[in-house]
Amino acid sequence: MAGRARATMKDVAALAGVSPKTVSNVVTGTVFVRPETVERVEAAMTELHFVPNLSARGLRNGRSGTIAVALPDLATPYSAELLHDLVEVAHERGLAVQVEETGAEPGREVELLSRARAHLIDGLILNPIRVEDSAVEYADHLPPVVLIGEVEQRVTDHVIVDSRAASRDITRHVISRGARRIAAIGGDENPEKETAASRLRLDGYRDALRDAGIEPDPRLEINPLPWTTPSAAAAVDGLIASGVEFDAVVAFTDTLALGVLHSLATHGKRVPDDVLVTGFDDVEMARFSSPALTTIGFDLRRVAEEALSLLNRRMTERTAPARSVTVPYELIVRASTGD
């Protein structure tokens, strides 16, 4: 007996009560469709087991239907949460996602840009840690690419959070709680260790100190590499062993802050009674640490949506001026600073 005929876009349109063009718009995600219409179309696609023919679509519009997302380190909680939102939003817009880890290596970025030029992918969302070393800084005739993160550049489209202002605000917060000897875990003067994130967050930390009349102490500025929980714990172990006094720690990521909490607990220091601790990123584990972590939060879903929108614009308007979108942040006060 012959198998059931494969459902077509017309079949989906008939079941959903819309035109085939509307179904196409839902599949490609390039034209706004009302949410209630999207819901009907997606329900019809599910009922009919309809699978969009991305290859055929690519032949018609010159696209593969696939983008790449490249992050420096996929193992971090922040990267995992950001990647989840990027993949989810891309799928909602009819795009497949190829995930890459660059290890902060410019050579890997060059390979990805070359792949985009050859139309093996339609575009690239890239998170370089230092634009000065990034392939983007030197590449001519860039394929569609959007940068995310703290890198400061005008070469291509960019989604950022104002890390300097956020770091200043969270440092001001611990100062308002009475702290004066505030350690910064994630930044120092060593240019070989410096990244865009460490530089901007260190600048914000120093801004807040100077605004309060506190002279920064280089002994309290420590940049453990890599930015992992164990390296942060070791850094605080060393700070305690040195005898340098401190009454607060501003960690430049939540991952680092968890290492800070571990070290302080190991040495019998109470948070927040003896030492105030803050993080940055508001990853899920920050809400469940002991004590819960005061941090800087921002909407990763919004980051993903803005990045995909910029990438789609770049794919259709290749000569448009580069745009930068700033996603707002908020100071989230929890028990680690005595809420």
Predicted regions and their residues:
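Bacterial carbohydrate/catabolite-sensing allosteric modules
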Residues: 1-2, 47, 88-93, 144-147, ...
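Alpha-helical recognition/docking segments in bacterial nutrient-uptake
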Residues: 1-7, 39, 54, 62, ...
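N-terminal helix-turn-helix DNA-binding module of bacterial transcription factors
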Residues: 1-66, 338
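Acidic/polar helix N-cap motif
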Residues: 11, 29, 105, 162-163, ...
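Conserved beta-strand positions in the central sheet of alpha/beta enzyme cores
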Residues: 22, 68, 125, 183-184, ...
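Conserved beta-strand edge residues that scaffold enzyme active sites
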Residues: 59, 73, 104, 130, ...
